[in-house]
Each structure stands twice: as structure tokens, then as C-alpha cells.
Regions:
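Selected transmembrane alpha-helices and immediately adjacent juxtamembrane segments
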Residues: 1-44, 129-179
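Residues within membrane-spanning alpha-helices of integral membrane proteins
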Residues: 10, 53, 108-112, 116, ...
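Transmembrane helix-loop junction
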Residues: 40, 47, 93, 97, ...
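Membrane-interface alpha-helices at helix entry/exit sites of multi-pass transporters
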Residues: 43-52, 76-80, 172-183
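Selective hydrophobic functional segments
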Residues: 50-103, 110, 190-240
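Transmembrane helix exit motif
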Residues: 61-72, 107-133, 224, 244-255
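Hydrophobic alpha-helical transmembrane segments in multi-pass integral membrane proteins
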Residues: 147-157, 193-201, 208, 245-255
């Protein structure tokens, strides 16, 4: 059982989750802030991850809704992506519940340099959709939705960033459509993970709902900036998120 809810826990979660969701609403990757927030609030590892998914799920729904409203979603790619992300996330969460946390940190250490190379080699995230075989585009998007959805259930930080990079650079989607589809996939993977965590008693419901209120505000403001300003805002935030990911994970592996 979690500790009784305290004012300190509430304040830490409100501030940390708002900042995380603001970043996530622009470019994804807010989990690198929100997951440590729940640790700082005093929750053990699996409970922190499950509670984070609850607040992220509600906030991401608001962000996704703004992209849908503005027409920045490719539904032919999006509907299968949602189903695959749900499935991948469920399996990823089951695996996460069975493993030691340090395994997850080593995974990030392996993935991070690969992502950094992709970002730094790309001069800017494309504003225009690239011509390519539509079957290949769909295969890339659907495979990424399943695999990264599994990673999101397994641990999570960086999920939105990884998806955005793949959808833009490998699947050739324009930045805004990629961002809209990323939000749908991220919402689906959050739903799959939070359901699995709830079934295993790994969600602090009250604290997660408090975090959800902060998440809604952060996602709404952040996604509005992404829609208005495109890659001028998203690219620097992607690079910042990757830097934060490295600063957090690498030292913890050697403690």
C-alpha cells in the first residue's frame, strides 16, 4: 500500500507533472520528468510507473484531442497503430512488473545513443510529407507503434520522442501529422499500461488523478505551441529531452 497522501506529495506531483506534460505536449518525452517526479513523491518503483501512466493517459488524451480537432491525424495509419500500441504496451507492462528496475536503465543506455545519432544527423524535422511507398510507410508506422508501445509499457520515458523521430525520418510524415499520430499511439500505449498496472494493484489512484489535472494543463499548453510553431519549437525540445534522459539514466547505472 502507498503512504498516506501528504501536502508535500501533492505539491511535488503538481509541479513536476505540469512541466513534464508541457514538454510532452510539444515533442513527447515528458516521462523523463514525470517518472522521477513520482519517485521524489515517495512512491516505490512499480507504483511510481503505474501512477505516472494514469496521469499521463488523461493529459495525453487532451493533447491528442487538439491534434484531431485541427486535422493533423492520418487515420488510415492511426487506427491499426492504436490497436498495436495497446497490445504492445500490455505485454511490456507485464514484463516490467517481473523485472528489476536496473534492467530498464541499461535498456535506455543502449537506445539513447542510437536516437541521438538520428536527431543530430537530421538537420530539421520535416514540415512536408515525403513521397514514398505507402505500404512501406504503413509498415514502419505500425511496427514502431507495437515496439515502442511495448517499451512504453515496459518503462516509458522518451516514448513520444522516439515515435516522433521514427514517424518523421523513417515513415516520411510531415511534422504536424506525425505529432498527431504520435499522440494517438502514446494515448493507446498509456491506456494499455495503466489497465495492466491497475489489474496488478500498482496505481495510487488519488495521487494519479491529482497528477492528471496538472497533466491536462501542461499538455493543452504544450500541444498548442507545437501546432502553431512547428519544428522551430519541437526540434530544440527533442534535443533537450534526450539530454535530460542521458543526465538522469547514466549516473544511476553506476550507483
Amino acid at each position: 500500500m502507498p503512504e498516506p497522501l501528504t501536502l508535500r506529495m501533492v505539491l511535488i506531483v503538481i509541479v513536476g507533472v505540469f512541466l513534464a506534460s508541457f514538454v510532452d505536449g510539444i515533442a513527447g518525452g515528458g516521462g523523463i520528468i514525470s517518472v522521477p517526479t513520482y519517485f521524489l513523491a515517495g512512491l516505490p518503483a512499480h507504483l511510481a510507473l503505474g501512477t505516472n501512466k494514469l496521469s499521463s493517459c488523461i493529459g495525453t488524451a487532451v493533447s491528442a484531442g487538439r491534434f484531431v480537432k485541427n486535422g493533423y491525424v492520418d487515420w488510415k495509419l492511426g487506427i491499426p497503430s492504436i490497436l498495436l500500441a495497446l497490445l504492445g504496451s500490455h505485454w511490456g507492462t507485464l514484463l516490467q512488473l517481473s523485472l528489476d528496475e536496473k534492467v530498464l536503465k541499461w535498456l535506455l543506455l543502449i537506445v539513447l545513443p542510437i536516437v541521438a545519432v538520428v536527431v543530430l544527423r537530421q538537420r530539421q524535422l520535416p514540415e512536408q510529407r515525403r513521397e514514398m511507398d505507402e505500404r512501406r510507410r504503413a509498415a514502419v508506422v505500425w511496427l514502431a507503434s507495437f515496439v515502442v508501445g511495448g517499451y512504453d509499457g515496459f518503462y516509458g520515458p522518451g516514448t513520444g520522442t522516439f515515435l516522433l523521430l521514427i514517424f518523421c525520418t523513417l515513415a516520411g510524415l510531415d511534422l504536424r501529422t506525425a505529432s498527431g499520430n504520435v499522440k494517438l499511439v502514446n494515448l493507446a500505449s498509456n491506456l494499455g499500461s495503466v489497465f495492466t498496472s491497475l489489474m496488478n494493484g500498482k496505481v495510487f489512484l488519488l495521487l494519479g488523478l491529482i497528477g492528471a489535472a496538472a497533466s491536462v494543463a501542461g499538455h493543452y499548453i504544450g500541444s498548442g505551441l507545437a501546432i502553431k510553431d512547428g519544428s522551430r519549437i519541437v526540434r530544440p525540445v527533442v534535443l533537450l529531452v534526450l539530454a535530460l534522459l542521458a543526465v538522469k539514466v547514466v549516473p544511476e547505472l553506476f550507483v
